[in-house]
UniProtKB/Swiss-Prot annotation:
Cofactor: iron-sulfur cluster
Gene: erpA
Organism: Cupriavidus necator (strain ATCC 17699 / DSM 428 / KCTC 22496 / NCIMB 10442 / H16 / Stanier 337)
Top-level division of the source organism's lineage: Bacteria
Keyword check for Iron-sulfur: yes
Keywords from the named record: Iron, Iron-sulfur, Metal-binding
The keyword Metal-binding is assigned to this record: yes
Subunit structure comment from the entry: Homodimer.
InterPro entries: FeS_biogenesis (IPR000361), FeS_cluster_insertion (IPR016092), FeS_cluster_insertion_CS (IPR017870), FeS_cluster_insertion_RrpA (IPR023063), HesB-like_dom_sf (IPR035903)
Coiled coil region boundaries: none
HAMAP family: Fe_S_insert_ErpA
Swiss-Prot/TrEMBL GO biological process terms: iron-sulfur cluster assembly
Name of this chain's protein: Putative iron-sulfur cluster insertion protein ErpA
Length: 122
């Protein structure tokens, strides 16, 4: 009798980041305004700010070898390997309220965050 090997059962692995519809839609709008469909949103962490690290956002046409990518609503999010360790599990969102409009990162790895929300410590 021949035994048939079954494929291993795999569970859905959660994405390393949450890139909200609101953020993706705003990035899509900004890319359309720039007139360059090759642009991708790069989110990164660098030293600075009042808490030690700060978030940065920029458009980039290039995907580097060590980048983690996520596509949402036709928009590509890029995170480099150094920033990845600080951002894994984070939510990248876009909020509009009476105080203005801005991209917001909710980061479970941050032990403290400054009042403006643009810098953090781990």
């Amino acid at each position: 009798m021949n035994a048939v090997a079954e494929a291993p059962v795999t569970e859905d692995v959660p994405a390393p980041f949450v890139f909200t519809d609101s953020a993706a839609d705003k990035v899509k709008q900004l890319i359309e305004e720039e007139g360059n469909a090759e642009l991708k949103l790069r989110v990164f962490v660098q030293g600075g700010g009042c808490s030690g690290f700060q978030y940065g956002f920029t458009f980039d046409e290039e995907v580097n070898e060590d980048d983690t990518t996520m596509v949402k609503n036709g928009v590509t999010l890029l995170i480099d390997s150094m920033s990845y360790q600080y951002l894994v599990g984070a939510e990248i969102d876009y909020k509009e309220d009476i105080n203005g409009a801005q991209f917001v990162i909710k980061n479970p790895n941050a032990s403290t965050t400054c009042g403006c929300g643009s810098s953090f410590s781990v």
